[in-house]
């Protein structure tokens, strides 16, 4: 059974690329045609590439490694969070902070601060502080939660791959992955450079439904891989 159908991709608008004046010539082999000034992505290639990415992610997950889901643009934020949580993986959907992979010790300290503030809120410490102090600490906690909430339980050394929505926007995350030799799977639109990505999924990275569909398939691959890992252990 195929992982995804052309019909699903069409219905979600995965085939709509960017305007023809905003394109990267390196994406030419993934383009089917041009219509009304918009590039149309070749969905036969997208189906094949999703299948390749699915098998790769499944293998990484079956080895007990983690997939870090990244998508900070508005259209990706919800899908990234939902699908990472569904597959019990880590995610960044607000802002990539420099060093999230390459300087995780510093990031870990900030996660420690978030955990400390959560504990203070839970154990009643906030109740004995002044209203002004509580507002300040709550604001700090919210900011930390937005940026770090999805990687609280992450061990950077166990990240086996990145799944990225829009490699142009997430270039800092990709460059950190390159330094560490971590492979990148990404939804790559017609304005992106596919050479920056190990597993290219040609598709629309601006439509919420398109992003959700592809992200859900990556999460499915993680879940299937983890089930395989559990079966192997048994």
Curated annotation (Swiss-Prot):
CDD domains: RPS2 (cd01425)
GO terms of molecular function: structural constituent of ribosome
InterPro entries for the chain: Ribosomal_uS2 (IPR001865), Ribosomal_uS2_bac/mit/plastid (IPR005706), Ribosomal_uS2_CS (IPR018130), Ribosomal_uS2_flav_dom_sf (IPR023591)
One Pfam short name: Ribosomal_S2
Name of the protein in its database record: Small ribosomal subunit protein uS2
GO CC term, one of those recorded: cytosolic small ribosomal subunit
Family membership: Belongs to the universal ribosomal protein uS2 family.
Top-level taxon of the source organism: Bacteria
Lineage of the organism: Bacteria, Bacillati, Bacillota, Clostridia, Eubacteriales
GO biological process: translation
Classification via NCBIfam families: rpsB_bact (TIGR01011)
Keywords for the protein's UniProt record, in alphabetical order: Ribonucleoprotein, Ribosomal protein
Organism: Clostridium kluyveri (strain ATCC 8527 / DSM 555 / NBRC 12016 / NCIMB 10680 / K1)
Keyword Transmembrane carried by entry: no
PANTHER family assigned: 30S RIBOSOMAL PROTEIN S2 PROKARYOTIC AND ORGANELLAR, SMALL RIBOSOMAL SUBUNIT PROTEIN US2M
């Amino acid at each position: 059974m195929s992982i995804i159908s052309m019909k699903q991709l069409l219905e979600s608008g995965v085939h709509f690329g960017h305007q023809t004046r905003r394109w990267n010539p390196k994406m030419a082999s993934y383009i089917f045609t041009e219509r009304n000034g918009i590039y149309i992505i070749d969905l036969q290639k997208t189906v094949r590439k999703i299948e390749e990415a699915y098998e790769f992610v499944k293998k990484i997950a079956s080895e007990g490694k983690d997939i870090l889901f990244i998508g900070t643009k508005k259209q990706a934020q919800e899908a990234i969070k939902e699908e990472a949580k569904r597959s019990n993986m880590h995610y960044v959907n607000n802002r990539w902070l420099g060093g999230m992979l390459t300087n995780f010790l510093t990031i870990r300290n900030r996660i420690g601060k978030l955990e400390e503030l959560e504990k203070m809120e839970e154990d009643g410490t906030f109740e004995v502080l002044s209203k002004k102090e509580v507002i300040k600490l709550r604001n700090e906690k919210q900011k930390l939660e937005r940026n770090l909430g999805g990687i609280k339980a992450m061990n950077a050394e166990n990240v086996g791959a990145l799944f990225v929505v829009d490699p142009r926007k997430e270039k800092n995350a990709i460059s950190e992955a390159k330094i560490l030799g971590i492979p990148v799977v990404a939804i790559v639109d017609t304005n992106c450079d596919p050479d920056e990505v190990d597993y290219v999924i040609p598709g629309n990275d601006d439509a919420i439904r398109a992003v959700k569909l592809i992200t859900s398939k990556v999460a499915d691959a993680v879940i299937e891989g983890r089930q395989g890992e559990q079966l192997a252990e048994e």
